[in-house]
Amino acid sequence: MEHQNAVKEALNALYHHPDDTVRVHADRWLQNFQGTLDAWQVADNLLHDSSSNLETLIFCSQTLRSKVQRDFEELPPGAFQKLRQSLTTLLKKFHKGPPKVRTQISIAVAALAVHVPAADWGDGGIISWLRDEMHMHPEYVPGFLELLTVLPEETFNYKIAARPDRRRQFEKELTSQMEAALSILSACLKISELKEQVLEAFASWLRLRHGIPGTVLACHPLVHAALSSLNCDPLSEASVNVISELIHHTASPSSGGISAQTPLIQVIVPQILSLQAHLRDSSKDEEDVKAIGRLFADVGDSYVELIATGSDEPMVIVHALLEVTAHPEFDIASMTFNFWHSLQLMLTKRESYSSLGSEASIEVERNRRLHIFQPAYQSLVSLVGFRVQYPEDYQGLSYEDLKEFKQTRYAVADVLIDAALILGGDTTLKILYMKLLEANAQTGNNFQDWRPAEAILFCIWAISNYVSVVEAEVMPQVMALLQNLPQQAQLLQTACLLVGAYSKWLNAAPASVSILPSIIRILMSGMGTSEDCAAAAALAFRHTCDDCRKNLCGYFEDLFNIYCMAINGGGGYKVSAEDSLNLVEALGMVVTELPLDQAKGALEKLCFSAASPLEEAAKEDLEKKHARELTVHIDRFAFLFRYVNHPEAVAAEINKHWAIFRVIFDARPWDMRTMESLCRACKYAVRTSGRYIIDTIGEMLEKIQFHYQQHHQPCFLYLSSEVIKIFGSDPSCAVYLKNLIETLFAHTTCLMTSIKEVTARPDIADDCFLLASRCLRYCPHLFIPSPIFPALVNCAMIGITVQHREACHSILTFLTDIFDLEKSVNEEQFVRIRDNIIIPRGATITRILIASLAGALPSSRLDTVTYSLLALTRTYRLQAVSWAKESVSLIPRTALTETESTKFLQALSDIAYGADVNSLIGQVEELSDVCRRNRTVQELVQAALKPLELNLVTAPVS
């Protein structure tokens, strides 16, 4: 009674106490209570207690359901019968509700069935038991019907802590009882008030995708009951669910596919098509129309392969789907978008025609089908284009409404791409251009209402990748039209995006040189209109300079003046610091096309404009500057060094401006943001310049080493990584590179001597082990014989179970690279050193990896951990299997059975003998599933494997 009263008091506090602190405390207490062994009896008692209020009933039913799902193994052997009896009594007690309580009890019984083999329920398993209960207690049928509904749903509920073998067995038990379950449902149809509930249960059983013959379902009373309900007003939601599941059932390979289900298809499809008139009925309830649209979309998605053949009968479905697409409500129309995409793939992908054999036959059939469907896709272009038009009240749209509108536009853009792939981009462009002319004519040929024109320009933007660069009929007129648009922000923004999207066309156009100045003026206008428009214009400027760089070489001074005005805010430009980087990149691409002498002068001007503000700042107190005041200029250096592909010119500039870089390094090594920006600029300078930067690299590395030991900035590591990539194999750099990596790694290993320290510095761990992998690849001769190598392996072992995704991935990748050393460095002395380090640690590494698979790391990391274990096993073969056997033997048999561990070890042994990786993946997933099936088991496994207990050893390097 004490626990029961405590639960009631906590629930009362949770729902009724005015103090938030008290409510939070009560909620936490109740959550903790649900995990206790006492929760079984307390929840059961309170559910049977007639004085319990609704809040108590809901909480206790959820608790009991959760306990059965997750903690069934807590109960002593033989508890099943008593638990089943109690749950059955509760199901009867709540057969009329409350619905939430009845549902939770039903799920609890279904979860019990997942745990307990069919034989324990008596002959025929739970279905026969359920049938008998319904016969003996017909007054409780509604409660039992809900149980019958949730049973197949629980087959795929991974909250239930069942072993994989038992879960598969349960699915087989249910599918073998499909006929009996449908028989029970058919009998319940006679009770008219239960019809909706019966149909929902039928839909649930159909989701098992069991191969019931189409001839059987075609004349089944449950199917006919669902079809007859389609004509009800309002439409029966349960009947729609049944018909939807029947459609999916007929297309499922496990049901024999469309050919085997033809009798059923011939019954349901005509019934669905007969609903087409309702799509045009404005008096019809919107939810009913949505349900009808869903059925048409299901038919299209499920039978797309048949429809794509182009035969006459399926074309009726295509015309019906066009009608759904035409519906004014976007939520209804968009249901068909997936069909149009799937059909496009079926019509264009070569795999769809592989059975035809010869290329000639494939081409003939492909053209025949495309010809058949082109009218439908032409209609599609007209039907979706208007949906991207800004609403009249667009200025009053909330943030969420504007976000939804943008999502609508991108969804329509995808449909237009599908149409362009069927019709050809040039044909689609012509259709859209005609719409543009119509829109212009309707508004008096001067775009008084800008919204229709903007919508069509957006559509033209969407298909840009599919319009030929030699298209000469429409695009010249579109580009001419852009020059006469009114200065409206959204319209100009879309015009700028369109210019950027068609930059390749601009470059290929015969009149490119004469068009470009007017195009640049459009972009300049965009930069001064609004921030969003300026962002689009800057992006378009980048694309235009990228693709038209040769034609723009002679305009560098003009482009530079535009750039200067934009970054200084002159001319009313509204380009943000971030968007200005697009302009930097744009000019960098043009400079790349200049001859070296001219490029040096151009780059010098650009770098001077970036360096001047930094030098002015250096005259003041750099330490007091806000990071953004510096990084905005340093980032421009980074983009110039990255995109100007003149190594000698870039080297000259980094050498010239190294003095200001050095000053910033020394003044703000504590400032992560500034250091990241500075290291990024140096990284691109190193990458582009290569050996031309050799005079500066030594001092750069000295700065990195010195400041890293003081301030531990991760960016110093990734800059070092770039240096290793470029200079790692250069003998003249060997001395200071060896000093660099030993200094950096020695300091890093001192920072990360426990998992707690790795967790506190995930960025350092990430960049450290990325650098280590680079060293293995580019300078193994400096790294592997180094005394720091074994210390770094120890550090990696410490950090394997770090929860930070990128850090964990870098650590595991580094270890995998060591195990796979022969793939990149096949030198015996290095392999011997590697073995001397790994073999003494092999058992511990294997134990940590298996612990990671079994729950020490999230299941999303399974692939990365598996690959590390795979590499270890392929290198050390049976020795690795022995390590794994030793680790697996630590796991208690209550958590992992002998059979389950044997399967895993056998798969690992097969890998040692050269088997394919797929043979291991399945068993890894099984091991992971079993060991994570509930919190108790997971904690038991981790306590046995002790992934944080490292047993580190000191081994000789050679």
Curated annotation (Swiss-Prot):
Keyword match Transmembrane helix: no
Signal peptide span? none
Q: What happens when the gene is disrupted?
A: Semi-dwarf phenotype.
Location in the cell = Nucleus
Q: Which GO terms describe its cellular component?
A: nucleus
One Pfam family assigned to this protein is: TPR_TNPO3_IPO13_3rd
GO terms classed as biological process: protein import into nucleus; regulation of RNA splicing
For this chain, one GO molecular function annotation is: small GTPase binding
At the top level of its lineage, which domain of life is listed?
Eukaryota
Which InterPro entries does the protein's record reference? ARM-like, ARM-type_fold, Exportin-1/Importin-b-like, Importin-beta_N, Importin_beta-like_NTR
Keyword terms: Nucleus, Protein transport, Transport
What main location does UniProt list? nucleus
Record-annotated Importin N-terminal domain positions = 26-93
Q: Is this entry keyworded Cytoplasm?
A: no
What role is this protein assigned? Functions as a nuclear import receptor for serine-arginine rich (SR) proteins. Regulates nuclear import of SR proteins that are required for proper splicing of the two resistance (R) genes SNC1 and RPS4, a crucial step for their functions in plant immunity.
Subunit info here reads: Interacts with RS2Z33, RSZ21, RS31A, SR34 and RAN1.
Q: Which family does it belong to?
A: Belongs to the importin beta family.
For this entry, the protein name equals: Transportin MOS14
Organism of derivation: Arabidopsis thaliana (Mouse-ear cress)
Gene it is expressed from:
MOS14
